[in-house]
Amino acid sequence: LKLPFKIRDYQFDAVCTGIQRKNAILLSPTGSGKSLIIYVLMRYLISSFEQDVLVIVPTTSLVEQMYNDFKTYGYDVEKYCHRIYSGKDKNTTKRIIISTWQSIYRFQPDWFSRFGTVFGDECHGFKSKSLTTIMNKCVEAEYRFGTTGTLDGALTHELVLQGLFG
C-alpha cells in the first residue's frame, strides 16, 4: 500500500479480523485511526474483488474527512473515489463511494447492487430506520463492517448492529 507511516498493531489486527470474518463491528476509541482501518480493508477488498465499496458516514464533514484521509494515505482519490452528499452528483463509475446516509437512503435497491463491501462509520448510529433500510438494500455486500468509538450498551441496539454488520 506504500503508506506514509507504519500501521499500528491494533489496526493491523482489526484489518485481519475483518478479512477473516467478512462481517464485523470494529470498536476503536476516537482518534485511534478508524479511517486507516477502513482504508486498508477497502484497498485489500477492492484489489481482490470486482464489486465496489460503499462507505457510509453520518455527516458531510465526515465525507470530506474520509476522502482527505484516503488522499493523505497516498490514494488517488480523484481517480477512484466519489463523494455523495447534497449538491454532489449521485451517479459515477468510480469504485469507491463515500456518502452520507441521508443522501442515499431513498435510492432504489438496484443502485446498491454494485457494492460487495459496505462500511458504516460511526455505526452506533445505525439503529435508525433509514440506516437499517440502506443496509437491507445492500444484498450483494458480502463484506460488512461497522466502525465506532462507542456502543451505547443497550442489548437491543447491540443486537441490531450485530444483525447488520456481524
Where are these regions (language model features)?
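Conserved pre-motif I regulatory segment
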Residues: 1-27
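The Walker A (P-loop) glycine that initiates the GxxxxGKT/S ATP-binding motif of P-loop NTPases
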Residues: 28, 122
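Conserved nucleotide-binding/hydrolysis micro-motifs of P-loop NTPases
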Residues: 60-62, 89, 103-105, 124-125, ...
